[in-house]
């Protein structure tokens, strides 16, 4: 486990529990964040309210309209920026419907928006006849001012088959084929594309795209599953390169080489009932639990082992569970006593990896 030593591990009236480098504060983040030291955390990863009044929940309302909601989130993120070390990164969740509000709040708080990771999934019920079926969510990649800290690309490549893609030359110093490929010189033992050479068999460059199967998928995909649909539209793959659909680790098993579009992106299952409620006495009733595996992926993109993550909207604790599993420290804030208790119970299971 990681060392429990942490600048935030000091007794405060709002501290609910601290253990194994993980701290949960019960309270409003607007009140708790100002008590934290400046430039004391390494990354921000959080799932704030969306501002649409999801399922009639009070905490997800728009605070009185667009401007009021953006001003509220800007205030929270301004404190997050103060607490975050210069040049460090974060991911902030948003629904497509109000992701422009969230991005505006990020920029107004002083962050730079660098990219958006889109998570596409196969389930979701339309909430009215004037809306499309919800099938995607956004994770906005932001950066604090200061020298840019690189993403951890090499540790998070997407697995491929054992076959070198046909478009890559196997002979160092040469270029496969002709035409436009002459603009892509090959490096010794890898491919060089202006960003340094790498071994093509080490996996694909992480994409800003994640996929989840439909709830109705079994051994074969259900109709309308985004994973199956992307593969279908990108063309057939050879039998020996078919992906292992239900693999627990995308970097193991068999993967596509250059065909089969879904294989080019990060696959993560939506959280099952057992995942959400493991070790929770009365079940996990939180309506927007995120997949632990997706949170691990995002954490590993922007932090090193042992570093400290801030989540000011902890919910039922998925970010903390993911941090625990990949040997990171975390400080989380949650306004609901019920969700704090669920998070405590989920974390009591300890690391699974």
Region locations from a protein language model:
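Core catalytic lobe of class I
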Residues: 2-353
């Amino acid at each position: 486990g990681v060392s429990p030593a942490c600048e935030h591990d000091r007794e405060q009236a709002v501290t609910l529990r601290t253990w194994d480098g993980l701290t949960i504060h019960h309270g409003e983040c607007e009140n708790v964040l100002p008590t934290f030291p400046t430039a004391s955390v390494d990354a921000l990863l959080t799932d704030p309210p969306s501002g649409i009044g999801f399922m009639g929940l009070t905490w997800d309302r728009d605070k009185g309209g667009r401007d009021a909601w953006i001003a509220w989130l800007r205030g929270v993120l301004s404190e997050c920026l103060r607490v975050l070390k210069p040049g460090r990164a974060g991911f902030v969740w948003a629904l497509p419907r109000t992701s422009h509000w969230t991005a505006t709040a990020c920029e107004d708080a002083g962050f730079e928006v660098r990219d958006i990771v889109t998570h596409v999934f196969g389930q979701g019920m339309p909430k009215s006849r004037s809306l499309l079926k919800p099938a995607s969510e956004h994770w906005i990649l932001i950066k604090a001012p200061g020298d840019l800290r690189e993403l951890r690309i090499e540790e998070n490549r997407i697995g491929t088959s054992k076959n070198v893609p046909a478009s890559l030359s196997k002979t160092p110093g040469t270029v496969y084929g002709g035409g436009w490929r002459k603009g892509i010189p090959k490096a010794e033992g890898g491919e060089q594309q202006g960003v340094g050479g790498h071994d093509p068999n080490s996996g694909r460059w992480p994409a800003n795209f994640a996929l989840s199967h439909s709830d109705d998928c079994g051994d074969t995909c259900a109709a309308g599953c985004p994973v199956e649909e992307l593969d279908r539209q990108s063309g057939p793959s050879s039998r020996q390169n078919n992906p292992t659909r239900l693999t627990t680790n995308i970097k193991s098993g068999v993967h596509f080489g250059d065909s089969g579009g879904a294989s080019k992106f990060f696959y993560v299952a939506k959280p099952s009932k057992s995942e959400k409620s493991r070790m929770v006495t009365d079940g996990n009733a939180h309506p927007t639990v995120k997949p632990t595996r997706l949170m691990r992926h995002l954490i590993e993109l922007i932090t090193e082992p042992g570093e400290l993550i801030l989540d000011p909207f902890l919910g039922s604790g998925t970010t903390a569970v993911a941090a625990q599993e990949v040997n990171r420290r975390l400080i989380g804030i949650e306004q609901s006593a019920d969700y704090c208790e669920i998070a405590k119970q989920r974390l009591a299971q300890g690391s699974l990896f």
